[in-house]
Structures are given as C-alpha cells and as structure tokens.
C-alpha cells in the first residue's frame, strides 16, 4: 500500500524537505501525520531536511526525544552558542528535553535549551529560530541552508536555490 502523500512525492520527486514552524505538535493531527510521513520519505531517499522550530521538534520526537515547556522563549531574541554561534529570534513554548539518538547538538541558548541539532549521518538540521521572520536574512543561515539543501545534488556549481 502506498499512501496518497508518498504517491504525490513519487510523482513530484522533491530534492529536499523544509518543515516549517507553526502550531505545537498535537494540535493538528493531520499535519503531524503528514510531516512524520515526509520525514519517513526523506529518510528512505536520503533527502536533505531543514526543520524550523516545530520542524526541529518533529525531527527530534521522531528520534525519541521528549518535549518540555519552556518560558522566556516567545517573541524574544537571545544568543546561541556551540557549533553555531549567533543572535537569533525565538517564538517557541516547547523545547526538546534531550538530544535525540543519532543527532548532534549544534547550538544551545544561555539557559541550556537546545536550539539546533543535526542528524549524524543524514543531511538533516533543525533550528528553533525562525530565519523567515527576520527583516534581513542572516548570512550564516543562508549559507547553512544552501549547503544543506544542495547536499544531495551531484553538481551544485550551476544550481540555484
């Protein structure tokens, strides 16, 4: 049996998956199911995935992480440090409680909230901040997203995203 989503994906042949932010996990079951299926498809075909906020939470919970409620992370800015160091915006009520299996932490906030992760062998990253909510995109975000989303292309010299 092939789900309607997988049938659609087989016809459109996406080269990457972007999971956007939005409502909390569990508020809209159909969206949750669809996005988990997108991750299954991306894993099966080794597609790059960029998960923004809720998208990162989906990636993490799919890998076994738990979510916890956090305060002070809605409509604010704060610094993140680690492999990624930046000042970012923040709009989330929940954070992942632990780094999921087969993932590496890329950044944490000052209060030790995990703000970015990457899969250890799949071309997947998750960021809790929202680059799309910035007036000017951060160069670091553009460079990381471009590199990640092009990671499965054979010859990226002439490709534009």
Where are the regions that the model predicts?
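Flexible gly/pro-rich beta->alpha loop and the following alpha-helix that scaffold active-site loops
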Residues: 1-50, 63
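A conserved active-site-flanking secondary-structure segment within enzyme catalytic domains
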Residues: 28-40, 60-88
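Proline-centered loop/turn at the N-terminus of a beta-strand
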Residues: 48-50, 104, 123
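Gly/Ala-rich beta-loop-alpha elbow adjacent to hydrolase catalytic centers
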Residues: 51, 55, 60
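Active-site glycine-centered loops adjacent to acidic/histidine catalytic or metal-binding residues
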Residues: 53, 92, 130
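Catalytic beta-strand/loop cores that center a nucleophilic Ser/Cys/Thr
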Residues: 84-121
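Active-site-proximal beta-strand elements of phosphoester/diester hydrolases
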Residues: 87-88, 125-129
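Acyltransferase
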Residues: 132-161
